[in-house]
UniProtKB/Swiss-Prot annotation:
This is Probable RNA 2'-phosphotransferase. GO terms for biological process: tRNA splicing, via endonucleolytic cleavage and ligation. Pfam families: PTS_2-RNA. It comes from the Bacteria. Belongs to the KptA/TPT1 family. The lineage of its organism: Bacteria, Pseudomonadati, Pseudomonadota, Gammaproteobacteria, Enterobacterales. GO terms for molecular function: NAD+ poly-ADP-ribosyltransferase activity; tRNA 2'-phosphotransferase activity. Removes the 2'-phosphate from RNA via an intermediate in which the phosphate is ADP-ribosylated by NAD followed by a presumed transesterification to release the RNA and generate ADP-ribose 1''-2''-cyclic phosphate (APPR>P). May function as an ADP-ribosylase. Its EC number is 2.7.1.-. Coiled coil: none annotated.
Length: 184
């Protein structure tokens, strides 16, 4: 595997998140309904847009991402963001899964008042993202300021017929979390 510095890997990961989750049209690619993009076309379009992108750099980002944000298709010809999409082009068909008793959501403390009023909503994304452990939730929340960890009564939600899914990188997904299912 080729050597790349941390900044180059982080910048490439952010670029891939942008085009594979939110704005594929920004560089002229099209994602299929499951979020897959042809790798050769992605590289070509990225280069035309002035981004340095190679298969070796993609391989390194996919292999070394601690959050496993991206995956390759079984034939190695396509790449996708595992979850976190806001583009209407994508509707990944995750299999419904029974969650553990509790899941966790990390957020910045400045969002707490709004969450206490409306619960957790997906916003521009397709799903609310939840973690199986508090440490991961804390890292997620810290990205936006002083973090607060919310406990989600996931099994109670599931018993009431509210569905959960789990992305291949372990992130739990649900459509919304009402205030009654949250512990502060």
């Amino acid at each position: 595997m080729a050597k790349y510095n941390e900044k180059e890997l982080a910048d490439t990961s952010k670029f891939l998140s942008f085009v594979l989750r939110h704005k594929p049209e920004a560089i002229g690619i099209v994602l299929d309904r499951e979020g897959w993009a042809d790798i050769d076309k992605l590289i070509l379009c990225a280069q035309k847009a002035g981004k340095r992108l190679t298969r070796a750099l993609l391989d390194t980002v996919v292999a070394t991402s601690d959050k496993k944000r991206f995956s390759y298709s079984s034939d190695g010809r396509c790449i996708r963001a595992v979850q976190g999409h806001s583009t209407s082009q994508v509707a990944i068909s995750f299999a419904e899964k029974t969650p553990p008793q509790f899941l966790y959501h990390g957020t910045a403390s400045r969002f707490l008042d709004e969450i206490k009023k409306q619960g957790l909503i997906a916003g521009e994304r397709h799903y609310v993202h939840l973690s199986a452990d508090e440490a991961t939730a804390r890292k997620v929340g810290a990205r936006h300021g002083s973090s607060v960890i919310l406990t989600v009564k996931a099994q109670e939600m599931a018993k009431r017929g509210l569905p959960f899914w789990q992305a291949e990188n372990g992130v739990w997904l649900t459509s919304t979390v009402a205030v009654e299912f949250l512990e502060w």
